């Protein structure tokens, strides 16, 4: 099990990116959250077994939204956290 903090930049707002990231997380049973930042990036914290989280990260890199595009994705390991769901923060 591992947890990461991610920041995605590119065409990631106003394209359904948060919603489709949540759908991907729910399908893979990843816990955490996703939210838009005022600077136009999208921030994500996610936790899952190692192989599942790697698959989730790959899905985010490829943009879960067909209208989106991730130009840069930073991924940093963070401590494990409590949570059973993946939510969209506003």
Swiss-Prot record:
Catalytic activity, EC: 3.6.1.7
Keywords: Hydrolase
Catalytic activity: an acyl phosphate + H2O = a carboxylate + phosphate + H(+)
Entries under SUPFAM superfamilies matching the protein: Acylphosphatase/BLUF domain-like (SSF54975)
GO molecular function, one term: acylphosphatase activity
Superkingdom of origin organism: Bacteria
Organism: Pediococcus pentosaceus (strain ATCC 25745 / CCUG 21536 / LMG 10740 / 183-1w)
Domain Acylphosphatase-like: residue ranges: 3-90
Keyword Hydrolase on entry: yes
Disulphide bonds in the chain: none
PROSITE patterns associated with the record: ACYLPHOSPHATASE_3
Database matches in Pfam families: Acylphosphatase
Top EC class for this record: hydrolase
Family classification: Belongs to the acylphosphatase family.
This protein's name: Acylphosphatase
Active site as annotated: 18, 36
């Amino acid at each position: 099990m591992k947890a990461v903090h991610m920041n995605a930049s590119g065409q990631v707002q106003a394209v359904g990116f948060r919603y489709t990231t949540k759908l991907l997380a729910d399908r893979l049973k990843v816990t955490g959250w996703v939210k838009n930042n005022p600077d136009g990036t999208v921030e994500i914290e996610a936790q899952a077994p190692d192989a599942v989280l790697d698959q989730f990260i790959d899905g985010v890199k490829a943009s879960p939204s067909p209208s989106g595009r991730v130009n840069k994705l930073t991924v940093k390991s963070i401590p494990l956290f409590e949570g059973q769901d993946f939510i969209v923060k506003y």
